[in-house]
Amino acid sequence: YAFEMYSLAANAGDSYSMNRLALMYDRGEHVEQDFYEAFDWYMKAAEAGLPAAMSNVASMYRHGEGVNQDYDEAMTWFRKAAYEGYSYALYAIGELYLGGYGVAEDSTEAAAWYQRASDAGEPNGHWSLALRYLYGDGVAMDTRKAGDLAYLALVNGLDLALEEFKEISTADTSPNFRRRIQELLKQDGFYRGSVDGSFGPQTMRAVEAAFGSAL
């Protein structure tokens, strides 16, 4: 029923419905997966001025789904979406610079875009910028700031942040970073243990309790 409803509205020219219909084709929800149909509907919605669709067009170009892979087109459409204030696109531009996709690899430029995304409240931006500060890649190393940003991503419900935190207990990360996370968990009432940088079961339970708590 949802598919028919969005299909009718999309064909009547509603840009939001065009993007929803494209998502259904993209993910194979209520209809057989079809990247080509998805791309066509994303493009129609993007040309109708919908920022989320502009970002989706860019993603299709980046991954070569439903269209030939083209990093220049990906950058163009991510920039259009970013210009319209779509925060995910700010993060995605950072990803293109970090990986050198269609541009010269530039971790400083990547960090600047992650910062813009983070400032706009994008959880992916918080997390990616946290990693730059944690390892001093593209910015001066600042493990405390890395902790603040990683925590922001966690409480804003970024699945990737929760998955990565589960690895942190064994990963070779800065003790200062881990202590900062514990301080923040304690401040928000999720953690009652000692701030020792050791990510044991008690800290991990606190991390899971904090996940998505700002939403």
Segments (PLM) and residue ranges:
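Short acidic, glycine/serine/threonine-rich helix-capping segments at coil-helix boundaries
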Residues: P175-N176, K186-L215
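Short coil/turn and helix-start
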Residues: N11, R27-Q33, E47, E65-Q69, ...
